[in-house]
């Protein structure tokens, strides 16, 4: 029964993405509640210090920033209470206003903010995700920072910190790779691909979703494997037009991995 429930949630997640392409993994300062009113409280985003320049790392591409002013920064799961049926999903709060719900190797992006209710002085947490955590909450943080209880309309959800999330796949053994593909590619319209020489691949679609894969190439085809509540396999045709890549019918220009990282972090 739990498996059927989870699959229905995932199906709805995929369908919902068709109408949420404008949401993005934003650094915006406010996450709107699903139903706002004129008396809605105002949250101010916790300030972070400017991040240091970092080298590109596929494993750390979506790693959250350390932010002492933001107790939500990190990876979490719903351990108890409302939404606990989604306990296999990982929730990522990146320390600068970007939220993601991660299913297997796929992430679906939204926004969040932490602040203070101007009328009551109560600490508030706003989050805009499709499932599990969506709305405006009061919250309390455990002494060790490993659990946060969020409350909305009298319903509690207990978030438990995840120290070692596993949504990035391990590199496959002896992958068959076309060396011309290796590197980062930009469509110029918000689609980014990265092909690693270790047989791992990454896609970011308009800042609304991201997916990690393992892949092989043969006869101008990429076979990409990823997990979303079970193993999925996609096949893509590709060719080259001069220095440009034509992948699945769309043209891409090669950029540095660091430039792709900068673009993704700007959402």
Q: What are these regions, as identified by a protein language model?
A:
Residues 1-23:
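Sec-dependent bacterial lipoprotein signal peptides
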Residues 23-35:
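Bacterial lipoprotein signal-peptidase II cleavage site
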Residues 33-68:
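Post-signal peptide N-terminal segment of mature Sec-exported envelope proteins
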Residues 56-77, 164-186, 267:
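N-terminal helix-cap/turn-to-beta initiation motif at the start of protein domains
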Residues 82-133, 187-231:
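N-terminal glycine/threonine-rich, aromatic-flanked beta-hairpin/loop signature
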Residues 146-158, 241-253:
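Short, exposed beta-strand-loop hairpins at the edges of beta-sheets
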Residues 258-267:
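Short, low-complexity, Pro/Ser/Thr/Gly-rich segments in the mature regions of secreted, periplasmic
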């Amino acid at each position: 029964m739990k498996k059927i429930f989870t699959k229905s949630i995932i199906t709805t997640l995929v369908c919902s993405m068709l109408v949420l392409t404008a949401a993005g993994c934003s650094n915006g300062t406010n996450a709107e509640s699903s139903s706002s009113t004129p008396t809605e409280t105002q949250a101010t985003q916790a300030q972070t210090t400017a991040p240091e320049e970092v080298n590109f790392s596929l494993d750390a591409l979506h790693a959250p920033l350390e932010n002492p002013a933001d107790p939500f920064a990190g990876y979490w799961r719903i351990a108890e209470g409302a939404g606990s049926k989604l306990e296999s999903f990982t929730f990522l709060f990146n320390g600068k206003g970007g939220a993601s719900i991660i299913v297997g190797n796929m992430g679906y992006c939204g926004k969040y903010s932490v602040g203070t209710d101007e009328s009551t002085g109560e600490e508030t947490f706003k989050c805009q995700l499709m499932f599990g955590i969506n709305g405006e909450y009061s919250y309390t943080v455990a002494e060790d920072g490993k659990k946060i209880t969020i409350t909305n309309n009298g319903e509690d959800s207990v978030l438990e910190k995840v120290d070692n999330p596993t949504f990035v796949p391990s590199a496959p053994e002896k992958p068959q790779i076309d060396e011309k593909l290796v590197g980062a590619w930009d469509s110029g319209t918000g689609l980014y691909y990265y092909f690693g020489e270790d047989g791992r691949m990454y896609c970011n679609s308009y800042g609304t979703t991201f997916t990690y894969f393992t892949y092989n190439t043969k006869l101008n085809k990429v076979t990409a494997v990823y997990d979303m509540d079970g193993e999925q396999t996609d096949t893509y045709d590709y060719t080259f037009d001069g220095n440009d890549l034509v992948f699945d019918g769309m043209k891409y220009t090669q950029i540095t991995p660091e430039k792709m990282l900068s673009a993704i972090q700007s959402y």
